[in-house]
């Protein structure tokens, strides 16, 4: 179906994509963030991150382009697609590959298999909940393409404008590596914004085992990212707890946006010590 990745150009891949869509009478659906990859250099970069004979979960099969090349290298590819029309296309495109299992369903709702890698051009509208699910399922490695703005949030450090709940929760579980920026021209149809490819490797030790506590604490804190810790703690946890963390030399005058991951974990541990309920 597809030529060798080293021998194909972006124009070739675009033409193949257009022909497949025309053949099956499929139009990309904007509400499902359907932008099909047509850049062989991007595909090669993704393939280079995944060891041979890996077991892979792909979120968003599309017409099966990336799936096809992953299947040539992987031991097994589970690929999830919500759009029934695209399931029909991908089933035909990938019919000769016995190591590919196509799953029709919502990636947020179905159970995931145990895999070595997750690979996906993550749909913008479900990026955050998908990453949370990755963490909860203990996905050890991932290569994801996300909108540039989301990528900056994932990579952001304390004090920066992009820093927030998603930065903290993801960095608690994963070491995140920036691979490369990807322009709109690498997809069809071209999205309005650039994307970025990131590689995520599970930390040997998570900063905190109870993800729910981290979610609850960051939810409280980042409702008021520009307020002081003193103000937030006093409002939600009371003055007795405020006095306790002050006695521990916790910087209560810092702004929420400046709290690094280590400080947030300390705050959670103080809550546990004092039996403070995180609502």
In which residue ranges do the predicted regions lie?
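Catalytic cores of RNA-modifying enzymes
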Residues: 1-220, 257, 262-279
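Long, well-ordered amphipathic alpha-helical subdomains in the mid-to-C-terminal portions
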Residues: 190-193, 200, 210-250
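Interdomain hinge/lid region at the active-site interface
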Residues: 253
């Amino acid at each position: 179906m597809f030529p060798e990745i080293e021998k194909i150009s972006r124009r070739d891949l675009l033409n193949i994509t257009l022909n497949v869509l025309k053949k099956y009478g499929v139009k990309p659906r904007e509400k499902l963030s359907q932008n099909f990859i047509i850049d062989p250099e991007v595909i090669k970069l993704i393939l280079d991150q995944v060891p041979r004979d890996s077991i892979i979960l792909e979120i968003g099969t599309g017409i099966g382009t990336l799936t096809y090349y992953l299947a040539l290298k992987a031991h097994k590819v589970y690929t999830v697609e919500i759009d029934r029309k695209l399931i029909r296309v991908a089933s035909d495109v990938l019919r000769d590959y016995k190591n590919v299992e196509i799953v029709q369903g919502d990636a947020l709702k179905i159970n995931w298999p145990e895999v070595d890698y997750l690979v996906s051009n993550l749909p913008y509208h479900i990026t955050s909940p998908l990453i949370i699910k990755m963490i909860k399922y203990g996905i050890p490695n991932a290569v994801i393409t996300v909108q540039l703005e989301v990528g900056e949030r994932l990579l952001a450090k304390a004090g920066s404008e992009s820093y927030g709940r998603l930065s903290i929760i993801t960095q608690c579980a994963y070491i995140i590596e920036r691979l490369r920026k990807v322009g709109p021209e690498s997809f069809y149809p071209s999205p309005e914004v650039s994307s970025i490819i990131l590689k995520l490797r599970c930390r040997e030790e998570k900063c905190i085992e109870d993800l729910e506590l981290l979610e609850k604490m960051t939810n409280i804190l980042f409702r008021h990212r520009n307020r002081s810790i003193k103000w937030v703690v006093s409002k939600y946890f009371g003055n007795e707890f405020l006095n306790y963390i002050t006695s521990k030399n916790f910087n209560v005058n810092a702004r929420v946006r400046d709290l690094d991951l280590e400080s947030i974990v300390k705050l959670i541990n103080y809550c546990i010590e004092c039996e403070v309920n995180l609502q």
